[in-house]
Every structure is written in C-alpha cells, then in structure tokens.
Amino acid sequence: MTDKPDFDKLKKSGYISQGNPEFFVVRLRVPAGLLTSEQMIEIGRIAKKYGNGSLHITERQGIQIPYVRYTSLGKITEDLEAIGTPPGSCGPRVRNITSCPGMPECSHGNIGTYELAKKIDDLFFNVDLPTKLKVSVTGCPNSCAKPQVNDVGIMGVVKPRVELNKCTSCGICVRTCREGAIKPLNEKISFDFNRCVFCGDCIRVCPTDAIEGEKKGYTIFVGGNVGRHPRFADKIVTFGNEDAVFKIIDNCIRVFEDEAISGERLGHLIDRIGIGEFVKKIL
C-alpha cells in the first residue's frame, strides 16, 4: 500500500489510524475471543515483525496490533490471513461477535456459546450498516457476556420441571435459587415462573435428579449499548430457537439499513419508532 490512505475505508476493514498517518492499529477478527496457542504465538511474532511488539486485548475480545506502518498493511494482512486471524472490522459494520465460555467450560452454561457465536459471525460479520452493530452471546442469566448492553444479545436459558416422585424435600434447590422462585409445597416443591430467570442452577444441584430441563432456548434482547448515551436492551423473546436468533439478527439489520439515521444506534432507533412497532418489523 503506497497510495494516499483512505482512512474511512481502511477503518471499516480493521486498519485504524493512530492519529499519525504513518502508523495504524490493525484489529484482528477473533469471533468469541477464541484462539489456538499456535495462533497466539504467531500473532506475537507478527506484532514484533510489523509493529512495536505490543498487543492489546479489546473490549470485544479481539486483538489489536499497534504501530504498524501504512506501507506494511498489505504484508501484515497476508501473514494474518495465513494463520486464520484476518483483520476485523470497525466503523459502521457488524463488529466482532463476543461470548462467554458457556458449555462445556462453564458449570453454569446452558448452551454452546462458542458454536453459536461462530455461526453468527459466519452469517453477519462485516455487514455494512448506517452505524456499528454489536452482538453478544452469553450462556446463562449471569450475563457474563453482557447481552443487555449489546445491540443484539442472546442468552442461554433452560426451563426446569420436577418429577415429584423423585423429590425428597431436601431443600437444596430452595436454598440455591437466588430468585426465590422455588417454594416447599406439601413436602415437595413448586416453581414460580414469574420469578424464575431460567438459569438452571436448581437442575444442577438436585441430588436425586428430580429436577430436569423441560426445554432449552435463547432469550433475545435488542437495543442495548453503552457509550455516551447508554441504553439497556429490551427483552423481546424468552424462549427462542436457533432459527429465531438468526432471523431476528437478519431482520434487525434489514430494519437498521432501511430506517436508521446516520450515526443512530439500534436502541435509539427503537426509542424513536417505539419498541412495539420495531418488534412488529422483526418478528
């Protein structure tokens, strides 16, 4: 790359000017923050070769290599693509998909977060939009991946049910439930699903396997963001399936493309047209 930089175009592709037109930060595409040890070693080598040897772990689980000269962007891109970590995206596009570990790494996980994040990345990463759109996948209502402050957030949930003939009234599930959603009833238990957040902790602690998962699914949030004008997301689906996840993201992008004002985040578009009207357009 020897011609005059087009900073906006470069930024969209993951090359971010540091203020000095000679140097750029190169942002890598790392869906769900997953890397092999071999990739990490090679990224370190590339950072020494083209930058100043330092790396930055981004808030969205990506990696940035600073102090890369403009004239080296072509070569560093070739090296990064060769190890499966090409430059990512910035600016008005679908950003790096983030996730918590989920199943099987986390004992609280209800879903395979990495797998879902990778599918979302394959379908939607780098799509051009009026402004940025961030997607996060979290394995349970502990919300470690912060779905409520992403433009689209997906949370793994499981609805419990009890086999009363197996219940010994030990009380472990009652003491475990942080929502007060399980109560003793006639020497057994009952669920209050108005209070239950579908975390699945009661299923995991039951010593007799009396509590099991009736169904698993995805709670879906839209319209969250932080930044200068933070907004908590709206929950629009409590138990969706995987197809619903993809459909909603696709429809959010379509509505965003058609109706967003330049620079307007998804949540602020929702505030402008109303959550009811927005839900009609995407469900």
Language model region names:
Residues 8-34, 98-102, 233-234:
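Short glycine-/aliphatic-rich beta-strand segments at the starts of folded cytosolic domains
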Residues 261-281:
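Bimodal "functional hotspot" detector
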Residues 2, 26-160, 164-168, 172, ...:
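Small-residue-enriched alpha-helical segments and adjacent helix-cap loops
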Residues 172-191, 197, 201-218:
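Iron-sulfur cluster-binding cysteine motifs and their immediate structural context
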Residues 138-143, 159, 172-175, 189, ...:
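Short acidic/polar capping segments at secondary-structure boundaries
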Residues 16, 152-156, 218-225:
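Short beta-strand elements
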